[in-house]
Amino acid sequence: MGLKAGIVGLPNVGKSTIFNALTKSAIPAENYPFCTIDPNVGIVEVPDKRLADIAAIFNPKAITPATVEFVDIAGLVRGASKGEGLGNQFLSHIRDVDAVLHVVRSFEEDNITHVEGSLDPVRDIETIETELLIRDIASVDKRLEKLQKNARMGDKDAKKELLVIDIVFPKMNEGILVHDIELTSDQRLLIKPLSLLTDKPTLYVANVDENEIMSEQRSVGLQKLFDFAEERGNAAIRLCGKLEAEISNLQDEERVFFLEEYN
């Protein structure tokens, strides 16, 4: 059983650094926008002690752990749907993911360019989600024409799906993300094949500096991000991508010592 997660965010927020930490890869993570162009894919086994305990009882020929496949795509910018930056065509690479990891820059660093010119995690989240929503609107618009044609021909399934689209599409055009639109579980199931990006479970990953990660209390800016996540109904975590990447490259004994030092 495997889970697939797509990593999104603005350029220079640490997506590739975090991808490297998660997958123990060594893809370039440079200080310039669009360092990542082609998608990077890494598969990670999920440790589970219960699996080892069960194997000890039944002694199977092979043990197959659960996996997570991470897909790191190029950074999106404001106006990507209109061709800004590298555009949004590479969003097709995460269309079939089960969840979205939205990496948000939450650290100050003069030597690392911020494409928006200043640090504002909530603004950056809204920028990315707007671009994802515009992509979803285009997907629904394309599907709508076919549904209407099939419904006129008496296709019952098309009629059912069309009823849901008639609820969802106007709200999307008002700027409402799909997962924020009130639908029954059956209605949401009908539009699942569309693989809409703003309908997927989303985790905000606040990429912070070492001082922030060592602090028990969140900074004012970081707290705003967590409050925003709660309003959205999404989860949020903080981590230091740079530190995690360093830890992932250590030998097991060194890693234990390092983690103890950083508590």
Predicted segments — roles?
Residues 68-70, 94-97, 125-129, 228-232, ...:
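Glycine-rich loops and low-complexity Gly/Arg-rich segments
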Residues 23, 27, 55, 59, ...:
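Signal for well-folded cores of large energy- and translation-related assemblies
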Residues 1-113, 142, 147:
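Conserved G1/Walker A P-loop phosphate-binding module
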Residues 91, 134-137, 237, 263:
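Short amphipathic alpha-helical segments with heptad-repeat character
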Residues 2-8, 13, 19, 146-263:
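C-terminal-of-GTPase-core extension/linker across diverse P-loop GTPases
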Residues 42-47, 74-84, 95-156, 171-184, ...:
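Conserved Switch II/interswitch segment of TRAFAC-class P-loop GTPases
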